[in-house]
């Protein structure tokens, strides 16, 4: 686990497991999972973020029980077959290459590395091709045994929901008489923003320069984050925002320009982004800073 901590492999495990859970379980093949959900006219998907993985289904209320059963099957009885893992490692490696070939995506990964240095939050969720190729089914199972526990699970349900129907379904699917154990400690203490100015760049043979400027923000568990959401909407989070109006609409110097907050447990940052012609990069960065200062 020391190696995992130092390299921030927790995120990579999460992403690989997310892919693998749709490849079949002890009770359903991959095509049966897809066919059963399609037969309900529903949607089954997942996503991995820096601090969580979410598996979700969207169905008619009359199919709630089947949706819970499928989700339970995915997270509790994954097949994790070696041949499936080998194929999926190739898929994830191709996804890594896709990000490398997309400067508009890559620049946000570079911003994270500049802000968080050697902490796990600096690492891309997809990992590297080397780390992805190193996984085995046993390593994935060990990670799931440690992390996919009742004490770390959060269930959310919205829509036409009858709680008297839902709760027994969830208890039967996930509790089974077991008590929720305390969640194990995090792989790494909450990361702090690096101090001082930092600059990271990647040279790509493309037409545009993609710029991200990062500033200290707020953790997800603070009241200040809500004020930051309001500020974001005014600065770069909408078509009427200052960045959009002054850089795109008035000057025509960028097609894509925006801002966004990024919060985690114990830390967070605020970012500005623009993609522009190379020779305009310095000027656009200056204009972005000017608009940010005007918000004071």
Where are these regions (language model features)?
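His/Glu-based metal-binding/catalytic segments typifying zinc-dependent metallopeptidases
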Residues: 182-241
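Short helix-capping/linker segments at secondary-structure and domain boundaries
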Residues: 25, 79-80, 239
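Phosphate-proximal small/polar/acidic motifs at interfaces that engage nucleotide phosphates
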Residues: 244-245
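Charge-rich, well-structured scaffold segments of protease-associated domains
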Residues: 30-184, 190, 201, 218-219, ...
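Single conserved hydrophobic/aromatic residue that forms the stacking wall/gate
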Residues: 2-13
